UniProtKB/Swiss-Prot annotation:
The keyword Iron-sulfur does not apply. Inhibits Kv1.1/KCNA1, Kv1.3/KCNA3 and Shaker potassium channels. Disulfide bonds join C31-C47, C34-C52, C38-C54. Keywords: Disulfide bond, Ion channel impairing toxin, Neurotoxin, Potassium channel impairing toxin, Secreted, Signal, Toxin, Voltage-gated potassium channel impairing toxin. It holds the Pfam family Toxin_6. It comes from the Eukaryota. This is Potassium channel toxin MeuTXKalpha2. Has the structural arrangement of an alpha-helix connected to a beta-sheet by disulfide bonds (CSalpha/beta). Coiled coil: none annotated.
Amino acid sequence: MSRLYAIILIALVFNVIMTIMPDMKVEAVSCEDCPEHCATKDQRAKCDNDRCVCEPK
């Protein structure tokens, strides 16, 4: 019975981690697509080392 609880706990922790992780990922958007990409988030586009960075307005 304790193995069942352990499996359920691991599944719940994994679910929480997978929910949080996409928010922390770095999006690989080229500088050409940066203005459109940041406009969808209502943020200002900035290109840094050939990488798109969205900053708050």
